[in-house]
């Protein structure tokens, strides 16, 4: 199902988290809330868009042949207007996938924000950009 940009814009203007959560519950889609550790860097910003997902895995050894940023950069380069980067770190509190550089790149492509259960770097700069980021820690 494709959701139009117009409908997403209306959702950003009208809907809020409790309405969405209660509606999903009434549809039998229970427990759809973010974990309590994932918090906005700026509680005044709203985030609603199409999810573009990525999964991070811990790397426990150095491998010169492995480009650990290849897929992350490709995902950010492919973001479209209205997209939200959603990066799962599988609850690992040692992974910090998002920062000011990716926020700047995502914003330049028209992306609306980022959600990650991982850590975030460059918090002051991201806040100054007013770029919505929800993260598992800083």
PLM region spans:
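Feature captures the catalytic cores and cofactor-binding loops of soluble hydro-lyases/lyases
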Residues: 1-138
């Amino acid at each position: 199902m494709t959701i139009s940009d117009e409908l997403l814009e209306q959702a950003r203007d009208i809907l809020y988290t409790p309405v969405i959560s209660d509606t999903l519950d009434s549809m039998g889609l229970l427990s759809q809330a973010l974990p309590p550790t994932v918090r906005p860097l700026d509680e005044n910003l709203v985030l609603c868009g199409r999810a573009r997902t990525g999964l991070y895995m811990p790397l426990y050894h150095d491998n010169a042949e492995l480009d650990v940023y290849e897929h992350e950069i490709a995902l950010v380069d492919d973001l479209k207007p209205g997209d939200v980067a959603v990066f799962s770190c599988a609850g690992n509190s040692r992974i910090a996938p998002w920062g000011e550089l990716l926020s700047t790149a995502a914003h330049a492509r028209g992306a609306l924000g980022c959600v990650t259960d991982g850590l975030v770097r460059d918090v002051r700069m991201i806040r100054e950009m007013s770029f919505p980021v929800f993260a598992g820690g800083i």
